[in-house]
Amino acid sequence: MNMYKLAQPVITDEQGRLFIENDWHPGPLPRNIELGEMSYPDTAYSFTTFFSKRPVGLKLGYASGNYGHSSFTTGVYGQITVGKFVVLQGIRMICNHSITIGDHCMFSWGCVITDSWFTDDKVFSREQRRAMLEETAKSYNRHLEFTDPKPIIIEENVWVGFGAIILPGVTIGRGAVIGCNTIVSENIPPYAVAVGAPARIIKYLEANDSEEVKRAALEEFAPIPTRKINSD
Protein backbone atom coordinates (compact mmCIF):
# COMPACT_ATOMS: atom_id res chain seq x y z
CA MET A 1 0.00 0.00 0.00
CA ASN A 2 1.40 3.38 -0.99
CA MET A 3 1.08 5.75 1.94
CA TYR A 4 1.20 9.50 2.31
CA LYS A 5 -0.19 11.85 4.92
CA LEU A 6 -3.88 11.02 5.16
CA ALA A 7 -6.77 13.10 6.45
CA GLN A 8 -7.24 10.48 9.20
CA PRO A 9 -4.65 9.12 11.64
CA VAL A 10 -3.65 5.52 10.94
CA ILE A 11 -1.59 2.97 12.85
CA THR A 12 0.32 -0.15 11.80
CA ASP A 13 0.39 -3.31 13.91
CA GLU A 14 3.28 -5.75 14.34
CA GLN A 15 2.10 -7.72 11.29
CA GLY A 16 2.25 -4.66 9.07
CA ARG A 17 -1.52 -4.32 8.83
CA LEU A 18 -2.93 -0.80 8.58
CA PHE A 19 -5.76 0.36 10.83
CA ILE A 20 -7.62 3.66 11.00
CA GLU A 21 -7.10 5.04 14.49
CA ASN A 22 -10.29 5.01 16.60
CA ASP A 23 -12.20 3.21 13.84
CA TRP A 24 -15.42 1.73 15.24
CA HIS A 25 -14.88 -1.32 12.99
CA PRO A 26 -12.01 -3.53 14.22
CA GLY A 27 -10.73 -4.79 10.87
CA PRO A 28 -7.65 -3.59 8.95
CA LEU A 29 -7.63 -1.86 5.60
CA PRO A 30 -6.88 -4.13 2.62
CA ARG A 31 -3.22 -4.28 1.63
CA ASN A 32 -3.96 -3.74 -2.06
CA ILE A 33 -5.51 -0.28 -1.87
CA GLU A 34 -3.68 2.93 -2.68
CA LEU A 35 -4.60 5.98 -0.61
CA GLY A 36 -3.56 9.34 -2.01
CA GLU A 37 -2.27 12.18 0.13
CA MET A 38 -4.98 13.83 2.26
CA SER A 39 -7.53 11.19 1.28
CA TYR A 40 -10.19 10.08 3.78
CA PRO A 41 -10.94 6.32 3.79
CA ASP A 42 -13.49 6.70 6.66
CA THR A 43 -13.70 3.16 8.04
CA ALA A 44 -12.45 -0.35 7.34
CA TYR A 45 -16.09 -1.43 7.40
CA SER A 46 -16.35 -0.08 3.84
CA PHE A 47 -14.08 -2.95 2.74
CA THR A 48 -15.78 -5.93 4.41
CA THR A 49 -16.86 -7.25 0.98
CA PHE A 50 -13.70 -6.18 -0.86
CA PHE A 51 -12.30 -9.36 -2.45
CA SER A 52 -10.13 -7.89 -5.21
CA LYS A 53 -6.84 -9.67 -5.87
CA ARG A 54 -5.59 -7.03 -8.28
CA PRO A 55 -2.23 -5.42 -7.31
CA VAL A 56 -4.19 -2.20 -6.74
CA GLY A 57 -7.82 -3.08 -6.18
CA LEU A 58 -8.81 0.46 -5.23
CA LYS A 59 -7.11 3.81 -5.67
CA LEU A 60 -8.46 6.82 -3.77
CA GLY A 61 -6.95 9.98 -5.20
CA TYR A 62 -5.59 13.15 -3.62
CA ALA A 63 -7.98 14.70 -1.05
CA SER A 64 -10.83 12.38 -2.07
CA GLY A 65 -13.12 11.13 0.66
CA ASN A 66 -15.28 8.13 1.46
CA TYR A 67 -17.98 9.31 3.85
CA GLY A 68 -21.11 7.88 5.43
CA HIS A 69 -19.96 4.25 5.38
CA SER A 70 -19.82 3.82 1.63
CA SER A 71 -19.12 0.23 0.62
CA PHE A 72 -16.80 -1.27 -1.99
CA THR A 73 -17.89 -4.74 -3.07
CA THR A 74 -15.47 -6.34 -5.52
CA GLY A 75 -14.81 -9.69 -7.07
CA VAL A 76 -11.26 -10.97 -7.41
CA TYR A 77 -10.74 -9.11 -10.72
CA GLY A 78 -12.44 -5.87 -9.68
CA GLN A 79 -10.55 -2.56 -9.78
CA ILE A 80 -11.91 0.82 -8.64
CA THR A 81 -10.05 4.03 -9.49
CA VAL A 82 -11.13 7.34 -7.95
CA GLY A 83 -9.54 10.63 -8.99
CA LYS A 84 -8.70 13.76 -6.99
CA PHE A 85 -11.12 15.84 -4.88
CA VAL A 86 -13.97 13.32 -5.15
CA VAL A 87 -16.81 12.99 -2.61
CA LEU A 88 -18.31 9.51 -2.10
CA GLN A 89 -21.18 10.08 0.31
CA GLY A 90 -22.83 6.88 1.50
CA ILE A 91 -22.74 5.10 -1.86
CA ARG A 92 -22.27 1.49 -2.91
CA MET A 93 -19.91 0.28 -5.63
CA ILE A 94 -20.14 -3.26 -7.01
CA CYS A 95 -17.18 -4.07 -9.22
CA ASN A 96 -16.12 -7.25 -10.98
CA HIS A 97 -14.20 -5.54 -13.81
CA SER A 98 -13.48 -1.81 -13.47
CA ILE A 99 -15.06 1.43 -12.30
CA THR A 100 -13.15 4.63 -13.09
CA ILE A 101 -14.12 8.03 -11.62
CA GLY A 102 -12.50 11.28 -12.71
CA ASP A 103 -11.48 14.29 -10.61
CA HIS A 104 -13.93 16.66 -8.86
CA CYS A 105 -16.95 14.33 -8.88
CA MET A 106 -19.71 14.25 -6.24
CA PHE A 107 -21.94 11.29 -5.35
CA SER A 108 -24.85 11.67 -2.95
CA TRP A 109 -26.43 9.25 -0.47
CA GLY A 110 -27.77 5.96 -1.75
CA CYS A 111 -26.09 5.91 -5.18
CA VAL A 112 -25.31 2.49 -6.61
CA ILE A 113 -22.59 2.03 -9.23
CA THR A 114 -22.39 -1.52 -10.56
CA ASP A 115 -20.38 -2.89 -13.46
CA SER A 116 -22.06 -6.30 -13.02
CA TRP A 117 -25.53 -7.49 -13.93
CA PHE A 118 -27.28 -10.68 -14.86
CA THR A 119 -27.24 -11.13 -18.62
CA ASP A 120 -30.21 -12.09 -20.76
CA ASP A 121 -29.22 -15.75 -20.71
CA LYS A 122 -30.12 -15.90 -17.01
CA VAL A 123 -33.67 -17.23 -16.70
CA PHE A 124 -35.52 -16.25 -13.56
CA SER A 125 -38.08 -18.99 -13.17
CA ARG A 126 -39.02 -19.84 -9.60
CA GLU A 127 -37.15 -23.13 -9.83
CA GLN A 128 -33.95 -21.54 -11.12
CA ARG A 129 -34.05 -18.77 -8.54
CA ARG A 130 -34.41 -21.38 -5.82
CA ALA A 131 -31.52 -23.45 -7.19
CA MET A 132 -29.29 -20.38 -7.58
CA LEU A 133 -29.89 -19.24 -4.00
CA GLU A 134 -29.32 -22.70 -2.56
CA GLU A 135 -26.06 -23.03 -4.49
CA THR A 136 -24.93 -19.58 -3.34
CA ALA A 137 -25.51 -20.61 0.28
CA LYS A 138 -22.71 -23.18 -0.12
CA SER A 139 -20.19 -20.49 -1.07
CA TYR A 140 -17.83 -19.33 1.68
CA ASN A 141 -18.48 -15.66 0.89
CA ARG A 142 -22.09 -16.01 -0.32
CA HIS A 143 -21.13 -14.48 -3.66
CA LEU A 144 -23.54 -14.58 -6.61
CA GLU A 145 -21.73 -15.04 -9.90
CA PHE A 146 -22.35 -12.35 -12.52
CA THR A 147 -21.75 -13.42 -16.08
CA ASP A 148 -20.94 -10.24 -17.99
CA PRO A 149 -19.29 -7.33 -16.11
CA LYS A 150 -18.70 -4.22 -18.23
CA PRO A 151 -16.45 -1.28 -17.28
CA ILE A 152 -17.92 2.02 -16.11
CA ILE A 153 -16.26 5.38 -16.78
CA ILE A 154 -17.38 8.57 -15.05
CA GLU A 155 -15.46 11.55 -16.36
CA GLU A 156 -14.34 14.68 -14.49
CA ASN A 157 -16.70 17.03 -12.63
CA VAL A 158 -19.83 14.85 -12.68
CA TRP A 159 -22.53 15.31 -10.03
CA VAL A 160 -24.71 12.28 -9.21
CA GLY A 161 -27.80 12.86 -7.08
CA PHE A 162 -29.42 10.91 -4.26
CA GLY A 163 -30.37 7.31 -5.02
CA ALA A 164 -29.18 7.23 -8.64
CA ILE A 165 -28.20 3.87 -10.14
CA ILE A 166 -25.45 3.58 -12.74
CA LEU A 167 -25.50 0.29 -14.64
CA PRO A 168 -22.76 -1.73 -16.41
CA GLY A 169 -20.96 -0.41 -19.46
CA VAL A 170 -21.99 3.23 -19.00
CA THR A 171 -19.80 6.25 -19.69
CA ILE A 172 -20.93 9.57 -18.17
CA GLY A 173 -19.32 12.56 -19.84
CA ARG A 174 -17.49 15.45 -18.21
CA GLY A 175 -19.62 18.00 -16.39
CA ALA A 176 -22.84 15.97 -16.53
CA VAL A 177 -25.47 16.05 -13.77
CA ILE A 178 -27.51 12.95 -12.90
CA GLY A 179 -30.75 13.63 -11.03
CA CYS A 180 -32.02 11.94 -7.87
CA ASN A 181 -33.25 8.34 -8.32
CA THR A 182 -32.21 8.31 -11.98
CA ILE A 183 -31.38 4.94 -13.57
CA VAL A 184 -28.54 5.27 -16.08
CA SER A 185 -28.27 2.34 -18.49
CA GLU A 186 -26.87 4.18 -21.54
CA ASN A 187 -24.05 6.67 -22.09
CA ILE A 188 -24.62 10.29 -21.02
CA PRO A 189 -22.90 13.01 -23.11
CA PRO A 190 -20.71 15.72 -21.54
CA TYR A 191 -22.56 18.56 -19.77
CA ALA A 192 -25.95 16.83 -20.06
CA VAL A 193 -28.55 16.89 -17.28
CA ALA A 194 -30.27 13.49 -17.10
CA VAL A 195 -33.27 12.49 -14.96
CA GLY A 196 -35.79 9.69 -14.73
CA ALA A 197 -36.02 5.92 -14.94
CA PRO A 198 -34.70 5.24 -17.50
CA ALA A 199 -32.54 8.35 -17.74
CA ARG A 200 -33.53 10.98 -20.28
CA ILE A 201 -31.65 14.17 -21.11
CA ILE A 202 -33.61 17.33 -20.31
CA LYS A 203 -30.99 19.96 -21.11
CA TYR A 204 -27.30 20.72 -21.57
CA LEU A 205 -25.17 22.93 -19.36
CA GLU A 206 -22.67 25.51 -20.48
CA ALA A 207 -19.17 24.06 -20.66
CA ASN A 208 -17.80 26.48 -18.08
CA ASP A 209 -15.49 24.33 -15.95
CA SER A 210 -12.18 25.48 -17.35
CA GLU A 211 -9.20 26.03 -15.06
CA GLU A 212 -9.85 29.79 -15.15
CA VAL A 213 -13.46 29.31 -14.02
CA LYS A 214 -12.33 26.97 -11.23
CA ARG A 215 -9.87 29.55 -9.93
CA ALA A 216 -12.53 32.27 -9.99
CA ALA A 217 -14.93 30.03 -8.07
CA LEU A 218 -12.30 29.28 -5.44
CA GLU A 219 -11.69 32.98 -4.96
CA GLU A 220 -15.44 33.55 -4.57
CA PHE A 221 -16.07 30.76 -2.06
CA ALA A 222 -12.75 31.02 -0.20
CA PRO A 223 -12.19 34.75 0.34
CA ILE A 224 -9.66 34.12 3.10
CA PRO A 225 -6.16 33.80 1.61
CA THR A 226 -5.01 30.19 1.52
CA ARG A 227 -1.68 28.66 0.77
CA LYS A 228 -1.31 26.81 -2.49
CA ILE A 229 -1.70 23.03 -2.21
CA ASN A 230 0.32 20.96 -4.63
CA SER A 231 -1.86 18.01 -5.68
CA ASP A 232 0.37 16.65 -8.42
Go through the PLM ranges and name each one.
Residues M1-N157, F162-I166, R174, P190, ...:
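Domain-scale signature associated with acetyltransferase and cell-envelope carbohydrate enzymes
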Residues I178:
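Binuclear metal-ion centers of metallo-dependent hydrolases, dominated by the metallo-beta-lactamase
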